[in-house]
Amino acid sequence: MASWPILSVTTFLPLVGALFIMLMKGEDEVVKRNARWVALWTTLITLAVSLVVLWRFDPSSAEFQFVEKKPWLAGTITYHMGVDGISLPFVILTTALMPICILASWRTIEMRVREYMIAFLVLETLMVGTFCALDLVLFYLFFEGGLIPMFLIIGVWGGPRRVYASFKFFLYTLLGSVLMLLAIVTMYNEAGTTDILALMRHSFPLGIQKWAWLAFFASFAVKLPMWPVHTWLPDAHVEAPTAGSVILAAILLKMGGYGFLRFSLPMFPVASVDFAPLVFALSVIAIIYTSLVALVQDDMKKLIAYSSVAHMGFVTMGIFAATVQGIAGGIFQMISHGIVSGALFLSVGVVYDRMHTREIAAYGGLVNRMPLYAAAFMVFTLANLGLPGTSGFIGEFLTLLGTFKVNNWVVTLATLGVILSAAYALWLYRKIIFGRLEKPSLAAIRDLGPREIAIMTPLVVLTILFGVYPKPVLDVSATSVTALIDNYHHALGAAGGTKAALLGF
């Protein structure tokens, strides 16, 4: 038990900052300036508190740490918070990217700045809460609550088709979550509790396992997203403001992968084995199909959005391989993708702020005017295609290695996606960066400024650091991943399940 509620502080501190901004009064320009600074300092302090959690975290233990548990609703539903080696990396990723998003919005958002900053701070609270919640109802409230601020961020501050994109995002994700709510009610009736730790120990009948697995899968597959329920993502990315795209790709998508790790494998192990061939098939289709679609895009954001779907295919493949390397690789891939995809969307935002277009054909030869930008964009592009020495390689390699132990045909097909990712990533870089600076509109384009350098530098450093030294991320999650696998196979053995079901795919 933590001596003080550090997870609650980490979770709700952004909400306190949002309240301060809400109560601001004065002239419009003064309120705008103060709202930006309060949001920035709030996210920086939240990051500092989360780093204290990381510093005090014991990676040698698979138990949940910094646990807070208080009675809440109906005697059985509790306010229960805690982190383990699986959830903590996502908490740190969230708190680390939020100050960057605030800085990225510093000059680009001029309309309703106060409301914009409030939306982002509320969203941070809901995202951190999702990764810390240890009660199913509490998790559901945080998980679903995140829809509202993101819906507003896209719908109010987005592009010309923002209303269509925001409603499509909202309806897709809400539909899947309705099924999850029905599964939660069923699980409560069966187990008599909504405590996640108790539900992990509960042995659900096979019929309930399969039905509940499908219900949770529907929600998490849309959130991740998996093929074929991915079509909301490109529209949402294209219309969202730059910082909205960063959070959408870097954090919100990861809630789906986290859900598979926290619920699908430990609570429904037999169903996870039975449905693993389905997940493998959808993952391979996502990797190959969306990579091919990315090759024909003429909008930079759409290309990166489709590449995100392909990369999440490696994540689901590794998770449901249910091997140590597969799951460790899936977690690392999500953390790496959070950094790299966020950086790519920020890179698009840099040139969009100058030229007000995302059309690939509108650019070319930027290296002649923007050498710093070209260097940073090169690092992120190489990481996106999984080049050794960058963080993108580690996750993909581990997921392929872990899945190969279960099904080598799946790995063979997925490897085609690695080749295709190199094709679309290098094509994008060549079209935008290389060549002569022939377009008159680009003649006066300026390189990265001090604020943009401050945003890009930590992302470049992390992309390279985790590529050559992945130990910090892998060590934090290693014990929890091993415990998850051990409990998973123990549950299969107790239920008479067998991993041989996977080999028949």
Q: What are the language-model segments listed below?
A:
Residues 1-8, 21-118, 193-201:
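Transmembrane helix-loop-helix hairpins at membrane boundaries of multipass inner-membrane proteins
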Residues 9-27, 218, 225:
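N-terminal signal-anchor/start-transfer transmembrane helix
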Residues 32-44, 164-174, 370-373, 450-458:
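Alpha-helical transmembrane segments and their helix-start/interface "positive-inside/aromatic belt" motifs
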Residues 41-56, 173-182, 383, 419, ...:
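Hydrophobic alpha-helical membrane-insertion segments
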Residues 78-94, 206-222, 411-418, 497-505:
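Hydrophobic alpha-helical transmembrane segments
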Residues 100-106, 125-137, 148-428:
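Hydrophobic transmembrane alpha-helices and their helix-loop junctions in integral membrane proteins
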Residues 144:
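Short phosphate-coordinating micro-motif centered on Lys-Gly-acidic
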Residues 370-372, 425-505:
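Cytoplasmic/organellar membrane-interface segments at the starts of transmembrane helices
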